[in-house]
From Swiss-Prot:
Cofactor(s) the protein requires to work: Mg(2+); Mn(2+)
Catalytic function, reaction form: (2R,3S)-3-isopropylmalate + NAD(+) = 4-methyl-2-oxopentanoate + CO2 + NADH
NCBIfam families per record: leuB
Gene this chain is encoded by: leuB
Keyword Amino-acid biosynthesis attached: yes
Domain of life: Bacteria
S-S pairs: none
Subunit-level organization: Homodimer.
Family: Belongs to the isocitrate and isopropylmalate dehydrogenases family. LeuB type 1 subfamily.
Binding site for NAD(+): 288-300
Listed name of the protein: 3-isopropylmalate dehydrogenase
Location in or out of the cell: Cytoplasm
Origin species: Dehalococcoides mccartyi (strain CBDB1)
Annotated positions binding Mg(2+): 224, 248, 252
InterPro entries: IsoCit/isopropylmalate_DH_CS (IPR019818), IsoPropMal-DH-like_dom (IPR024084), Isopropylmalate_DH (IPR004429)
Length: 365
């Protein structure tokens, strides 16, 4: 099969980890006789340097003509000053909005070989395997009104409003139900319905949509309680769905269960994934650009590689090939190979490129 992909390496360690991801994808393509055509674009700080914007209209148009988009990392400390008119992260928000990417899917799975690499006790994280679904294009991050001003008394004020429509809630909740019905048939919906009106609407919509999925057990959990339970009993969860802000915070918390943010992939989809469907999506590791370790060959490429596996599953309809990559990663980790972020005594320490080579070798490319 033939596929057209837009590749956005981005900032910091982005180009390095993307190289390893494409190395693995090329091995899969060779083994299964697929063709992936790559077209490259700029996003983030490197785009600001060249074009004055964090995402150019040309790059967005390129993405829209692709079967999927691969992104590595966005962020540059040179643009951290909040007074600057444009920031690298603006490109990511524009990409999500411009491509209609409303559903962020983040698997959190602890490899057996890494249970002692996390800050949580091994007996607690062992067996952790759940999926976070975060709404991406609504809520406080896309606030209207959103403003900052100074009062006549000289007091600085700012406001961001959290707004959700029932349509926005329903479509992301259906993503949760669709994934839950093909797993353990258990869905946890996270909100703050004891305080926020938007969360009360969220909970009401979840209850209504649940009628279409009688086989799925639904539980409503307040966001603060969820934050505690993720640490106390992560194996309790299977599929979690929540709004934008809560999801942003909770998914970073959950990343520590896996030992490193360098282990976790993500998919941002423009549709509801169901068996037999191909959904346009953006695929990226959850980690940042990590500029302090860029160009040192020490960044962990596994999150990018696993993001490519998710692309094969959701946007290309290639489940066997996706499992091939995931299995190769598991085997390499089980053999004791590790990048510096997950390294422990007894492991064989590898650099970025060397980890990519080992996973490629396991696939047979």
């Amino acid at each position: 099969m033939d596929f057209k992909l837009t590749v956005l390496p981005g900032d910091g360690i982005g180009p390095e980890v993307m190289d390893e991801g494409l190395k693995v994808l090329n091995a899969v393509a060779k083994k299964y006789k697929h063709t992936f055509k790559y077209q490259y674009g700029l996003i983030g700080g490197c785009c600001i340097d060249k074009e004055g914007v964090a995402l150019s209209p040309a790059a967005l148009a390129m993405c829209k003509k692709s079967d999927a988009v691969l992104l590595a990392a966005v962020g540059d400390p040179r643009f951290d000053d909040p007074k600057l008119p444009v920031h690298p992260e603006d490109g990511l928000l524009a990409l999500r909005k411009g491509l209609g990417l409303f559903a962020n899917i983040r698997p959190v799975k602890v490899a057996p070989s890494l249970v002692n690499s996390t800050p949580i006790k091994a007996e607690i994280v062992k067996g952790t395997d759940f999926i976070f679904i975060r709404e991406l294009t609504g809520g406080v991050y896309f606030a209207k009104p959103k403003k900052r001003w100074t009062t006549p008394a000289g007091i600085r004020k700012a406001t961001d409003s959290m707004t959700y429509s029932e349509n926005e809630i329903e479509r992301i909740v259906r993503v949760g139900f669709e994934l839950a019905k093909n797993r353990k048939k258990k869905l946890v919906s996270v909100d703050k319905a004891n305080v926020l009106l938007s969360s009360r609407l969220w909970r009401q919509i979840v209850i209504e949509v649940a009628k279409d999925y009688p086989e799925v057990k639904v539980e409503h959990v307040l966001v603060d309680a969820c934050a505690m339970k993720l640490i106390l009993a992560p194996t309790y969860f299977d599929v979690i769905v929540t709004e934008n802000l809560f999801g942003d915070i909770l998914t970073d918390e959950a990343s520590m269960l896996a030992g490193s943010m360098g282990m976790l992939p993500s998919a941002s989809l423009a549709g509801i994934p169901a068996k037999g469907t191909k959904i346009f999506g953006l695929y990226e590791p959850i980690h940042g650009s990590a500029p302090t370790i860029a160009k040192q060959n020490i960044a962990n490429p596994i999150a990018t590689i696993l993001s490519i596996a998710m692309m094969l599953r959701y946007s290309c309809g290639l489940e066997t090939e996706a499992v091939e990559i995931e299995s190769a990663v598991d085997k390499v980790l089980a053999a004791g190979y590790a990048t510096i972020d997950i390294f422990k005594e007894g492991n064989t320490k590898l650099g970025t490129a060397e980890m990519g080579n080992q996973i490629t070798k396991m696939i047979g490319g």
